[in-house]
Amino acid sequence: MKLIPFPYPLNIGTDVVHLPRILRLINRPDYFHRFTRRILHEQEQRDFRTRFSLPPPSSGAEKTGLNPITPDMARWLAGRFAAKEAARKAAPAGASSLGWKDVIVRVGEADKGRPEIVYLDPMGCGETGGGRVGKLSISHDGDYVVATVLAAG
């Protein structure tokens, strides 16, 4: 049998996150803000603060522990974590070629509010710089969050 390669360079990545693991991490003393700064791009950090009505980092509230971590916050962060891991796996050069902040999860304006993954152009600045858009699906079920990314390579 003669095998014919698929005619389009497509890559797929999937990741599953156990929500209690994320909850354990972000509930550790002084780790919540460290975790969000580590995995979220600046735009995603702003989106997170806006979505959950959190004060800006300059307010000092993060040091006082005044912001209780809600299950919705944990679910949102777990979704971003899974999406970014899936995006890294779908990257044409492989997961090790991308850092956490090299990809952004954003809500697509033209696609009825569906989330999408953006591979940032290393020469761009993220928000105003260029990037490549990939398809993203995130699903939440009980203690698990799963994300799948389809990217052209």
Curated annotation (Swiss-Prot):
Gene Ontology cellular-component terms listed: mitochondrion
Domain of life of the organism encoding this protein: Eukaryota
Principal subcellular localization: mitochondrion
One family name in Pfam for this protein: ACPS
Localization per record: Mitochondrion
Catalytic activity reported: apo-[ACP] + CoA = holo-[ACP] + adenosine 3',5'-bisphosphate + H(+)
EC number: 2.7.8.7
Keyword Cell wall biogenesis/degradation: no
InterPro entries the UniProt entry points to: 4-PPantetheinyl_Trfase_dom, 4-PPantetheinyl_Trfase_dom_sf, ACPS
Identification of the protein by name: 4'-phosphopantetheinyl transferase B, mitochondrial
